[in-house]
Amino acid sequence: MLVVLALVVLAGATTLLGVRTGTASTTDGTWSLQGRYPQIARSGLDVVWQVRVTHPGGFREPIRIAVNGSFFDIFETQGFHPEPSKTTRDDRWLYLEFDPPPGDEFLVDYDAYIQGSSQLGRRGEVRLMDGERPRLSVTYRTWLAP
């Protein structure tokens, strides 16, 4: 029992049980999609969730992102920044639509922390949509430490 306690104390002292941010990215040569997400987190702590879309030549149409809706169940939030111009949801996906930004890059942040009642992590997926079909997608997993 003392060995287990010592390992937990050591892990905490070396920040192994703190928040770690991961990055998942993909490109098709023209469009790029990058997601930053809480790879390891603990309840009550602020975390990073961010999506970046880049496209040389800018954006002529709204940007539509789909996120598996169950991923957000572990968070308390103040919302998205910028706020979506339109949101819809089906049984699996939360669709976020944003007005086209100036320039070649779009960035959205999700201001959130892990709910105190969250005990298990989640798998996540972000899709950059092209109409009703995904153009690019990234997947990731958040693990919650005790």
Question: Would you name each region that the model predicts?
Answer:
Residues 1-28:
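A eukaryote-biased signal for short, well-structured alpha-helical docking elements
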Residues 29-67:
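Short extracytoplasmic
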Residues 43-46, 89-91, 101-105:
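Solvent-exposed, conformationally flexible loop/turn segments
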Residues 52-55, 112, 128:
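Hydrophobic beta-strand positions in extracellular immunoglobulin-like domains
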Residues 69-82, 133-135:
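Short aromatic-acidic-glycine turn motif
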Residues 102-119:
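Low-complexity, intrinsically disordered segments enriched in Ser/Thr together with acidic residues
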Residues 118-138:
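Serine/threonine-enriched low-complexity regions used as flexible
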Residues 141-146:
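Short beta-strand edge segments in extracellular beta-sheet folds
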